Amino acid sequence: MASPNGGEDFESSLISLENLDRASPDLWPEQLPGVSEFAASFKNPITNSPPKWMAELESEDIEMLKELGSLTTANLMEKVKGLQNLAYQLGLEESREMTRGKFLNILERPKK
């Protein structure tokens, strides 16, 4: 066990005499020049208008976003897997159609 005076020694070893009354840029200089200005450019005051990316969305798109937002993690992963499988199947179908077009010579450029 530690001695009764050991606690005081431990506390005195934790005292820091560092002066922290400087401005934060002096304490934590910017590591990547320009990052602060870039981040500040995206801080918009709170307004009633929707963000630019949301202005082009239709009501069906917003409903889909709400639906995806309400899914659990497992359900969302299933949805993503389904989309990946669909994209893969579409790629296979496109490959077959391109091969078919090649054999039918419909993709060749006309000879001059």
Swiss-Prot record:
InterPro entries: DREAM_LIN52
Alphabetized Pfam families for the sequence: LIN52
GO cellular component, as recorded: DRM complex
GO BP terms in the entry: regulation of DNA-templated transcription
Family recorded in the similarity comment: Belongs to the lin-52 family.
Record's subunit section: Component of the DREAM complex.
Protein name per the record: Protein lin-52 homolog
